[in-house]
Amino acid sequence: RFCGSVDAIRALNEGRCTVAGFHAPMQPAASSLVASTYRPLLATGQHKLIGFAVRQQGLMVAPGNPLGLAAWSDLLRPQLRFVNRTLGTGTRLLLDDWLAQQGLDGRAIAGYAHEESSHAAVAARVASGQADAALGIESAARAHQLDFVPLMHEHYWLVCLKSALDTPAVRQLLAVLSAAGWNAELGQLPGYASEALGGQVHSLKRTLPWW
């Protein structure tokens, strides 16, 4: 089932799934909104991380990037029509974290209140001409014949309860993620790269520098 990163971890904690996926910047500050949002949801000794992928987040724009967008700050242009992700998604969290770092809130971005639930949905809005830009991943942009302006790299982690590590399903998942064939498949997705520690199990404190 698809849902955003924050909602996915909540689903895991409520017993509605066995494994959840979430993404976070490579080096978020311990005081960042990203860290303060994820930290209460993950408990040392209870949750374990599984290496999955490294990917890029950036701006999805019309072919040729007619507005010349190149940086986060370009989202503050008064005439820019932006389409946002819904609250509870990791991509929305990235945007809100950037705004907080600038001392701004969503009112600074025209279209901040216009929301869609997935990368594909915001890409479709840009492709249809209803929006000038959206924050998202390159694979969704390319699937809709859009250009992509990379802004940052991030880790995409899987997380499960420690008690689930010995279940057949999770053991099989770890085996797949550790296989060379999986890494080759992942590398075919635009904007994705295999995680050096893919398929390996990690503790929160040793792996997340902002913990």
Predicted segments, located by residue:
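Short helices/loops that flank or line small-molecule/ion binding pockets
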Residues: V6-A20, P25, E115-Q130
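A ligand-binding cleft/hinge motif common to bilobed small-molecule-binding domains
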Residues: G21-Y38, A123-M152
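Short loop->beta-strand "edge-of-pocket" segments that line small-molecule binding or catalytic clefts
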Residues: S73-L93, D97
